Amino acid sequence: MVKANGHSLTSKKGKGKVVLFFPTYEREFDNWMPFPYLYLAPFIEKAGFEVCIIDSRVEPTWEEMLKKELKDSFALGITSMSGPDLTTAMRASQIARDMDNDICLMWGGHHASALPDEVFNEDYADFVFLGPAEFTFPVVLEAVYLKKEIPSDIKGVLYKRNGKVLGSRQVNAAIFDYPEPPAYHLIDVEKYRSKNNVVAYFKTRGCPFKCTFCATGNFNVSHKLREQYRKEIRYLVEDLKFRALCFRDPTFFLKASTVMDVAELLHSIGNVRWKGQARGTFHRQYTPEQFKFMRKSGLTSVMFGVESGSQRVLDFMDKKVKRQDYLKSAKVLNDLGIEMYASFMFAIPGETIDDLKETISLMHQLKKINPNIFLQNCIFLPLPSTKMFRDAVALGYKPPTTLQGWSKRSISSKFEDRNDITWMEKSVLTEYIKIYNDEFGEYKHAAEKEKTGEYVSPMHG
């Protein structure tokens, strides 16, 4: 296993060094590895550069580490979402600016991809990468390192020159079928090992659906090659000794042949628990024999983004699923003895009190069919570049216009922590929250319930 002993890990290559910085979120650390960099780093190394990953979530002294590593680096890469993680992202950029104005700052991730001009306006970035950057980041690094012009035909890369933002705003396609394995050698894996020894894994990038609240569907879909995902899964289980896998693909169960191949692999390894995300149509995508084999192979939980119990709202979200589908999937999983983990969204733009009551009704129905179901509540968070973000704006939502503003918005699942729900009329919101609180009381997120023992994930074994 990779050990860092409190020090950052750096690959040794012949050219200059690049630091990749991962910011801190508001919610409690959930043991996710810094996946964007695990995918990007091999391509940077392949181009001959040294790579150092600093993850502020697991490094209490990340500022000192960053200053040390930047002393002999020529570029700093930063990824971020549209929320509290921007605070440490901005701080990292400022540290680099204060140390040496020649350090090239390169931003990527959902927020920079959605609102690149805001990032440039505050002088936190020299380059912004739109969408996946495995094939563009090394090209730009090479040009910066050699002090050459950026190739004019490169897509999905923006930069500022004489006060103007130049480059291509064409978002790069999602590509995941390359042979390069994730750069686990650049992190201390033990810092991401949870009590239940579970590791997250992505077999697919992108999503074929276009749910109006989600930013993932803005890109196309690409799958890891069979040989590659089998090799990587074996490495995680047999070499790194993880005993539970959480497949985080948005629609992991969509392709039955691939899922059964994964189930057969895990069954052959033995003593591995696993879970994945599914659509409501899960109940009709597999035969009874396939369902039973998945259970035998270690499937312990299936996650659903149900979102709403109102068919009107589901259609508005373009979910392409029927309310009844979730009830049927709940029955299938209950009969198999597999946990159903269902997530719901509240305070959706355009949602009515009647819609809320239909959602609560569906939750009761699901609980009756599957008594061991875990119900997760989330409050709608407008994500830039999504249709539902634009819907919220049309209904009165005034989004932040600066990185500082975005960094201060809460991603909490508690109404008392949210003061930005301006897309609902005050009188409606007041009644909405009363009905919600009467039903759920003092709501706790899954992480909070695990901490107090109110919820024990089947992934614990």
Regions found by a protein language model. Give the residues of each.
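A short helix->loop->beta-strand "cap" motif at the edges of active sites that frequently abuts
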Residues: 16, 98-104, 125, 272, ...
